[in-house]
């Protein structure tokens, strides 16, 4: 549903955007729980080259292969139509990508993402930051965890990672596990 008056009234029409493979429950080996929770944001800076764009980011699990992926779609017409979903990360059958979060830098419209990348053949897990300077037309990604960690399938990590950005200062936050102990981390990213 949509509103043209800042939420005072809503149209009666609902629109299904995409089939959500895996839905809320995504099975990633060695993680107690993961989810495909969609993240929805808008670029609300009138000076941004992408002003008014709506962005959607979520994770899926392929029912046949069990592979997970982080997807992205955008609308440039107030949600009337949406781009076909694309992967934020490089295509790779050797990794699962999951537990994503996204933000838009209100000062310039740059998009930033954080998500886990876990080997499909081992417990080895890293944290990845991805960014887009062109409204999601393309993405750059970088592993930001200083070293890989190995999760335990018996310990609950939480349901979310998070990321904030303003004036090209980007701060993702995530939990990791070392020797059975969960700690919270961030990266100090100054984006140019």
Which stretches of residues belong to each language-model region?
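Extracellular, repeat-based ectodomains that mediate carbohydrate processing or recognition
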Residues: 1-192
């Amino acid at each position: 549903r949509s509103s043209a008056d800042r939420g005072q009234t809503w149209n009666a029409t609902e629109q299904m955007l995409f089939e959500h493979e895996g839905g809320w429950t995504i099975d990633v080996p060695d993680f107690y729980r993961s989810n495909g929770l969609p993240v929805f944001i808008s670029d609300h800076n009138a000076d941004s080259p992408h002003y008014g764009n709506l962005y959607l980011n979520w994770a899926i699990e392929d029912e046949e292969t069990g592979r997970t992926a982080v997807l992205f779609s955008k609308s440039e017409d107030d949600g009337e139509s949406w781009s076909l979903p694309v992967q934020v990360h490089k295509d790779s059958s050797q990794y699962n990508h999951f537990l994503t979060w996204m933000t838009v830098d209100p000062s310039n419209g740059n998009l930033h993402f954080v998500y886990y990348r876990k080997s499909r053949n081992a417990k080895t897990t890293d944290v990845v930051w991805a960014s887009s300077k062109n409204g999601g037309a393309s993405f750059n990604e970088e592993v930001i965890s200083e070293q890989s960690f190995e999760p335990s399938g018996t310990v609950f990590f939480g349901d979310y990672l998070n990321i904030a950005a303003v004036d090209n200062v980007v701060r993702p936050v995530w939990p990791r596990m070392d020797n059975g102990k969960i700690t919270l981390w961030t990266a100090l990213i100054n984006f140019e």
